[in-house]
Amino acid sequence: MSEAKSSQPDPAPEQPKPFVAPCHDRPPSATLQWLRDGWRDYRAAPGLSIAWGTFCMLLSWSVAWMAWRVGGWVLLLSLLSGFVFVAPLLAFGMYSISRKLCMGRTPTFAGTLRAVRRPIANSLVFALVLLVIFLIWARAASMVHIFFPSTGTLHLREMAVYLGVGSAVGACFAYACFAASVFSLPFIANRDVDVITAVVSSVNAVLRNRWTMFAWAVIVATLTGVGFMTGMIGFIVIMPWLGYATWHGYRDSLDVDGWDVLPAHHD
């Protein structure tokens, strides 16, 4: 007598994830709401915000001091210009704070450190990408040096050409880095997603909402400049605030429901 086979339905095949996260259209005025939401998070977790901001300030001081001791003002300006390439990686802990607050939970310092370590593999890959961009930028900056006036007397017109070309080249690399990182890192911090999908989704959001994201880039650059003008003391407030605001911009701009949420009980 043959044994009856169990009639269990076959498990449904896993739905393939899209290559890029859908993007919502957002007006330039949305950036002001992101800033308001970011400031609300800063006030909701002032101790953690000040701690992370102080860390950014001390790190910036250390880099500036070493650059000045080793290479003088030329290396100092180069490293400060390259700050835009590494600053996004400092924001993982801040994304964790906003993530917890959005869930109605209380963030802790230990939890933010664990959240920074969790996507370490994707972070290292992204850091490698930023390093490549930074090295290309450094090479381009050295090539721009040919526009530096070679005569003993510096004329305003010659300096204007040099500064204009250098600023244009730096702005192109900075905006490319901005497009790749602005929403990809919050995406990685929040969902089970690979680096390529996160970066493509971020670039797509920048291209689709070009004026909104241009306005956001101007805001980020302006506030970062204010931080430098205060001897980097302003980073205590500015860096966490921008990190939180970027998190809310990511949630407002990308539809990431197609990817699994990373567990929050280890944050």
What kind of feature is each model-predicted range?
Residues 1-267:
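Hydrophobic alpha-helical membrane segments
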